[in-house]
Regions:
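Non-catalytic terminal extensions that flank enzyme cores
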Residues: 1-17, 35-40, 137, 152-156, ...
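N-terminal Rossmann-like or analogous alpha/beta NTP/dinucleotide-binding catalytic cores
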Residues: 1-115, 209-210, 214-227, 285
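Noncatalytic linker/hinge segments flanking ATPase motor cores
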Residues: 19, 48, 81-86, 138-141, ...
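Short, mixed-charge aromatic SLiMs
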Residues: 48-58, 240-244, 292-300
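Alpha-helix initiation and N-capping motif
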Residues: 56, 81, 104-107, 120, ...
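A general structural signal for well-ordered secondary-structure junctions
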Residues: 69, 97-98, 116-117, 133, ...
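Short secondary-structure transition/capping segments
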Residues: 81-96, 118-125, 143-153, 275-289
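Active-site cores that bind ATP or allylic diphosphates and position pyrophosphate for catalysis
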Residues: 105-248, 254-259, 308-313
Length: 313
């Protein structure tokens, strides 16, 4: 592969049918990669306990039905746990981790305390300050600890990092002591995605802008591990009329739902293209023309607000 080759990726979780918002982001990630003459990889983020095996194949079928293709075989995070363990071992050797016994409720209460709240969404550092004796007592309590990244000096608090986004420009976000490994021993999202993107040679990450706050953490971690940092492009989400993220309870929001209403995969593809301000196509095979004229600078910057039809029956 040439050093200049663009490598994009799509990384859904096989926990259910993809809805229109998922498919729209997949289409965008594919267009970014293919319009640059690059590769488009598929990775299943399947470390979540909510994974349901039947959705590996159904998600592949839905995306293929819209005319999107990918390079190589899809990979699964569940097959790559050794990579995550190696990364964690590296950070542990450098004394960049510590055990955390906090519950979500305890974190929320500590972050909101009047003696100096942490920035919104940031871990307040409770377990970082535990003495050895306190840590031993926590371990004896039987709660399996998570593993957090140690960011900066003990008295410094969360850091800030500015990243450049292809669609949104400069974004400054918090880099706190985020989780690397969950209490059940599984790699946490931020660690797994950084390790995977580097291992797969990903140069470009196109994803929903709900993940923008995670980007400074991921860039910081990649640099700590000596890994290449991809370019990022965060795109607006699909929302329902109430301004909330589209969900399956909102109506006919999956490809299967739309087919049951008598629509075709082409109808769904054109709906997605129209939402992006792109020309509609007469057949699935006409996507090459969209790729040829694709310009990310012309994409909408606002969410797509859409009210899907009711489910049939």
């Amino acid at each position: 592969m040439s050093p200049a080759t663009t490598v994009g990726r799509w990384a859904p979780s096989p926990t259910g049918d993809l809805h229109l918002g998922n498919l729209r982001t997949a289409l965008l990630a594919w267009l970014f990669a293919r319009s640059a003459g690059g590769q488009f990889l598929w990775r299943f983020e399947d470390l979540d306990g909510a994974v349901r095996p039947q959705f590996y194949d159904s998600q592949l079928r839905d995306v293929a039905a819209l005319g999107l293709d990918w390079n190589g075989e899809p990979v699964r995070q569940s097959d790559r746990v050794d990579l995550y363990r190696d990364a964690i071992a590296d950070l542990r050797r450098r004394d960049l981790t510590y055990e955390c016994f906090c519950t979500r409720r305890e974190i929320a209460e500590a972050a909101a305390a009047p003696h100096g709240p942490s920035p919104e969404g940031a871990y307040p550092g409770t377990c970082r300050r535990l003495s050895r004796a306190e840590r031993e007592r926590k371990r004896a309590g039987g709660r399996p600890p998570a593993l957090r990244l140690r960011v900066g000096a003990d008295d410094a608090g969360p850091a800030e990092l500015t990243v450049v986004d292809r669609q949104l420009g400069d974004y400054t976000g918090i880099v706190d002591d985020f989780v690397l490994q969950r209490g059940d021993g599984a790699a946490a999202y931020n660690l797994a995605v950084v390790v995977d993107d580097a291992a797969q040679g990903v140069t470009e990450v196109v994803r929903g802008n709900d993940l923008l706050p995670s980007t400074p953490r991921q860039v910081h971690l990649a640099k700590l591990l000596g890994l290449n940092v991809p370019l990022y492009a965060h795109v607006p989400l699909m929302l329902n009329p109430q301004g909330r993220r589209l969900a399956k309870r909102d109506g006919a929001v999956t490809l299967r739902d739309r087919l049951a209403l008598g629509e075709t995969a082409l109808d769904v593809l054109n709906l997605l293209l129209n939402s992006l301000g792109l020309e509609q196509v007469e057949s699935i095979g006409d996507l090459d023309a969209i790729v040829e004229h694709f310009d990310s600078a012309s994409l909408p910057r606002q969410p797509w607000v859409y009210e899907p039809p009711a489910l049939k029956g």
